[in-house]
């Protein structure tokens, strides 16, 4: 009893490692696309913990691919220049000047900060944008009217990502994309992550958000849906109970699973080590979406 009390913390750590073992075995060599955004990008401690999770995933055999946003930092930079941020249905109105600033902030600042942090933690990251290696080809998105240089992805060339993964690197992708017209397009990071996950036939697509996951009742924080098959997810969308920023995220997950991604996850990026908790524990912490009904495990 004395020894158990003395080594209590160490025993707990050992139990956690044992619980993770089947997941490490199951996902070894598999690709996981992570959309990194929200509070996890703004809080220094959360930022470090997310990158620690990513590096650990790589060391235990998974192939993480990060796709990041940066909306708040873009808005902050625009404000310093006296440029007002305008949005239509959550999409940033992007004129030529704004497009230049979006590219500068996403590719030149945020992307390199993420790469530096991963490298400092012992990983090997390479930062790229959708322009590099013709990764993300886009055209003007007119679904919400003409918002300027807002694009929709029409083609994904995963060759550069696969090359980086094969050589042991962690790809970090800014969703600034190119068009056949020679223009630069600002593409929604959730959408870009979903398209990349589909093209890679990823094991998992994980969206880090500022909510617990998908709620059955948005007014009831205890109504988290931990697992959904596609039929359930589509019915929930059609019911009108999903609103706000969760609509495009759930749509993105549904489409990804329909197009070959095995599991899509919407998790709370405000929780410490949320990626590890979702991937390597029996219960997980957010909402997991799959094509068919789930067994009793989190695999």
From Swiss-Prot:
Q: Which reaction does it catalyse?
A: N-acetyl-L-glutamate + ATP = N-acetyl-L-glutamyl 5-phosphate + ADP
Q: Which GO terms label this protein's molecular function in UniProt?
A: acetylglutamate kinase activity; ATP binding
Ordered alphabetically, the record's keywords are: Amino-acid biosynthesis, Arginine biosynthesis, ATP-binding, Cytoplasm, Kinase, Nucleotide-binding, Transferase
Name the residues annotated as site: Transition state stabilizer.
35, 249
Task: Name the Gene3D superfamilies for this protein.
Answer: Acetylglutamate kinase-like
* EC assignment: 2.7.2.8
The lineage's top-level taxon is Bacteria
Which pathway does this chain act in?
Answer: Amino-acid biosynthesis; L-arginine biosynthesis; N(2)-acetyl-L-ornithine from L-glutamate: step 2/4
Q: Name one GO biological process term.
A: L-arginine biosynthetic process
Tell me the InterPro entries matching this sequence.
AceGlu_kinase-like_sf, AcgluKinase_fam, ArgB, Asp/Glu/Uridylate_kinase, NAGK-C
Q: What is its main location?
A: cytoplasm
User: What is the annotated localization of this protein?
Assistant: Cytoplasm
| Positions annotated to bind substrate | 70-71, 92, 186
Q: What span is annotated as the signal peptide, if there is one?
A: none
Q: Name one GO cellular component term.
A: cytoplasm
Q: Which family does it belong to?
A: Belongs to the acetylglutamate kinase family. ArgB subfamily.
Q: What does this protein do?
A: Catalyzes the ATP-dependent phosphorylation of N-acetyl-L-glutamate.
Which HAMAP family does the annotation name? Answer: ArgB
Q: What is this protein called?
A: Acetylglutamate kinase
């Amino acid at each position: 009893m004395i020894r158990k009390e003395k080594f209590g913390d160490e025993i707990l750590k050992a139990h956690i490692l044992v619980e993770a073992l089947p997941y490490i075995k199951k996902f070894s060599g598999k690709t996981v696309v992570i959309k990194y955004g929200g509070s996890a990008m703004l809080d220094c401690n959360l930022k470090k913990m997310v990158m620690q999770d990513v590096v650990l995933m790589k060391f235990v055999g998974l192939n993480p691919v990060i796709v990041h946003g940066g909306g708040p930092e873009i808005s902050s930079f625009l404000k310093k220049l006296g440029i007002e941020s305008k949005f239509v249905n959550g999409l940033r109105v992007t004129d030529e000047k704004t497009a230049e600033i979006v590219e500068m902030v996403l590719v030149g600042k945020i992307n390199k900060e993420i790469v530096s942090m991963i490298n400092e933690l012992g990983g090997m990251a390479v930062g790229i944008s959708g322009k590099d290696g013709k990764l993300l080809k886009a055209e003007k998105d007119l679904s919400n009217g003409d918002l300027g240089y807002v694009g929709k992805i029409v083609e994904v060339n995963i060759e550069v990502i696969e090359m980086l993964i094969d050589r042991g690197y962690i790809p970090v992708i800014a969703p600034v994309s190119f068009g056949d017209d020679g223009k630069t397009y600002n593409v929604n990071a959730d959408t870009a992550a979903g398209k990349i996950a589909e093209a890679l036939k990823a094991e998992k697509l994980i969206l880090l958000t500022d909510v617990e996951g998908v709620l059955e009742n948005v007014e009831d924080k205890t109504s988290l849906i931990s697992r959904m098959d596609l039929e359930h997810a589509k019915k929930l969308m059609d019911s009108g109970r999903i609103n706000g920023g969760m609509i495009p995220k759930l749509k993105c997950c549904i489409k990804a699973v329909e197009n070959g991604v095995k599991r899509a996850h919407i998790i709370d990026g405000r929780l410490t080590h949320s990626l590890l908790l979702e991937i390597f524990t029996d219960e997980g912490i957010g909402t997991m979406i799959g094509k068919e009904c789930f067994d009793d495990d989190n695999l």
